[in-house]
């Protein structure tokens, strides 16, 4: 079963994969990184004018990384706005995804957090740098293959 956006993308020959619907009936699509920017622009023009959230996760140790976008179609007088979830999978080695900052400004800190925790580079992001960890931090703490450095806690002298 296809949702409205998926049917529209198929009709116009845009490559994607439908991952079905979640428990709330929200359609989930899988998009390749090289197709993400054009599909993001199309989604915005199609009416998905609000980026509700963006997050990222490590699919499996040594496997792919995923950047997840929850888009909402806000319209006047509509109590239940239409939503869609888009997942962009990227290889662990040199993970790169086009930034959607220039489409939805709310992607700014969310993409930076995904970069900081998982190391996904968002191309054309204006300020892509660490947001939670110090700049000197080595590695990506939320990757499943991350090895935590040895820390020695200094006890307070009483």
Swiss-Prot record:
MF-aspect GO terms: NADH dehydrogenase (ubiquinone) activity; quinone binding
Compartment list: Plastid, Chloroplast thylakoid membrane
Thylakoid as UniProt keyword: yes
Transmembrane parts of this sequence: none
GO biological process, alphabetically ordered: photosynthesis, light reaction
UniProt EC number: 7.1.1.-
One cellular component (GO) term of this entry: chloroplast thylakoid membrane
Record-linked Gene3D superfamilies: NADH:ubiquinone oxidoreductase, 30kDa subunit
Membrane topology: Peripheral membrane protein
Subunit structure: NDH is composed of at least 16 different subunits, 5 of which are encoded in the nucleus.
Family: Belongs to the complex I 30 kDa subunit family.
Function recorded in the entry: NDH shuttles electrons from NAD(P)H:plastoquinone, via FMN and iron-sulfur (Fe-S) centers, to quinones in the photosynthetic chain and possibly in a chloroplast respiratory chain. The immediate electron acceptor for the enzyme in this species is believed to be plastoquinone. Couples the redox reaction to proton translocation, and thus conserves the redox energy in a proton gradient.
NCBIfam families named in the record: PRK12494.1
Protein name: NAD(P)H-quinone oxidoreductase subunit J, chloroplastic
Species: Buxus microphylla
């Amino acid at each position: 079963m296809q949702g409205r956006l998926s049917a529209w993308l198929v009709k116009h020959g845009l490559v994607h994969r439908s991952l079905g619907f979640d428990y709330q009936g929200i359609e989930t699509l899988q998009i390749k990184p090289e197709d993400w920017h054009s599909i993001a622009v199309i989604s915005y023009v199609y009416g998905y004018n609000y980026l509700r959230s963006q997050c990222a996760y490590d699919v499996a140790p040594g496997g792919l990384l995923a950047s997840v976008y929850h888009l909402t179609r806000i319209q006047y007088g509509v109590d239940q706005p239409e939503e869609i979830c888009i997942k962009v999978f990227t290889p662990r080695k040199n993970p790169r995804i086009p930034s959607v900052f220039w489409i939805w400004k709310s992607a700014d800190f969310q993409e930076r957090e995904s970069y900081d925790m998982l190391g996904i580079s968002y191309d054309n992001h204006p300020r892509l740098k660490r947001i939670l960890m110090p700049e000197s931090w080595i590695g990506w703490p939320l990757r499943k293959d991350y090895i935590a450095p040895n820390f020695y806690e200094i006890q307070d002298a009483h």
